Amino acid sequence: MSDEKTEQPTDKKLEDAHRDGETAKSADLTAAAVLLSGCLLLALTASVFGERWRALLDLALDVDSSRHPLMTLKQTISHFALQLVLMTLPVGFVFALVAWIATWAQTGVVLSFKPVELKMSAINPASGLKRIFSVRSMIDLVKMIIKGVAVAAAVWKLILILMPSIVGAAYQSVMDIAEIGMTLLVRLLAAGGGLFLILGAADFGIQRWLFIRDHRMSKDEVKREHKNSEGDPHIKGERKKLARELADEAKPKQSVAGAQAVVVNPTHYAVAIRYAPEEYGLPRIIAKGVDDEALALREEAAALGIPIVGNPPLARSLYRVDLYGPVPEPLFETVAEVLAWVGEMGASGTPGAEPQH
């Protein structure tokens, strides 16, 4: 049936969807970018963050409550909170920037409020049931299960690897605990980023496939869009005809005036040859045309009394020469015969034997 959506979406269909805020993207890829950027940031600034983290731990554990305990505790908490904010704010800014870049890399720049508009279908129970049992929902469920199993397995494996460090931290100093904590955090971010990168790459492929699938078109929609884009075929043909007429009018009008002869095909081609040694050392093509243009050149030549020579092979060969260009060397002999015949005819006033074709 023509209503079945079996055709791939056109470029215009995809552009319209993008303009409406509908794009293929994977949240897992964005999460991977954030986690890996966090890992890289901590690895590059480990010494700075380590010092600040140790200072915070010292501040939290070294509270002198011998005098004014309540005031001392308030000051300590306020100072601790301020230092924590100052330490995490740049990290949060970097994470937000990386998340935006990762999303932009997948979707491009999208400025649309349509995705947040209220749609009646969203509160329609029938539409809700249809969405629940849709292919996209089933795929999302499978992805959720796979992601949960993968994350659980990765966390368990990481715990087994890091368990000695975690247990040993109980016997370490505060400074050593801070260093161990930074190392564990970097490893966690690296492992999480790698896992979500793999999941995100697969998810992006799935999202792209679903996006194309959801925007498939019927044959009628493709025809209608093509008609709207290109216009009605009859009108399009009229436009082309008008464009040809305007192009013909814009062409400089050719004339055979000054030519020694016009070589014809006999009706399809007409080429005017001029030979004036004082102007140019070789014979030149000063006018040429096919069909209607050829007929006009023949009529003008007849009116001006310029000899018309029927030589189909020569006419076709000369027509391929650029306008106002010289006669090519392979045609010298044949053109010379034509010009000699024209000269004899002009000298005697009566036509002689036409040159052999």
UniProtKB/Swiss-Prot annotation:
Membrane topology: Multi-pass membrane protein
Source species, domain of life: Bacteria
Transmembrane regions listed in the UniProt entry: 29-49, 84-104, 149-169, 180-200, 323-343
Chief location bin: membrane
Subcellular location(s) of the protein: Cell membrane
GO cellular component: plasma membrane
Biological-process GO terms, alphabetical: protein secretion; symbiont-mediated perturbation of host programmed cell death
Alphabetic keyword roster: Cell membrane, Hypersensitive response elicitation, Membrane, Plasmid, Protein transport, Transmembrane, Transmembrane helix, Transport
UniProt-annotated stretches for the region Disordered: 1-21
Physiological role: Involved in the secretion of PopA, a proteinaceous elicitor of the hypersensitivity response in plants.
UniProt record similarity statement: Belongs to the type III secretion exporter family.
The protein's name: Hypersensitivity response secretion protein HrcU
Organism, scientific name: Ralstonia nicotianae (strain ATCC BAA-1114 / GMI1000)
Organism placement in taxonomy: Bacteria, Pseudomonadati, Pseudomonadota, Betaproteobacteria, Burkholderiales
Gene expressing this chain: hrcU
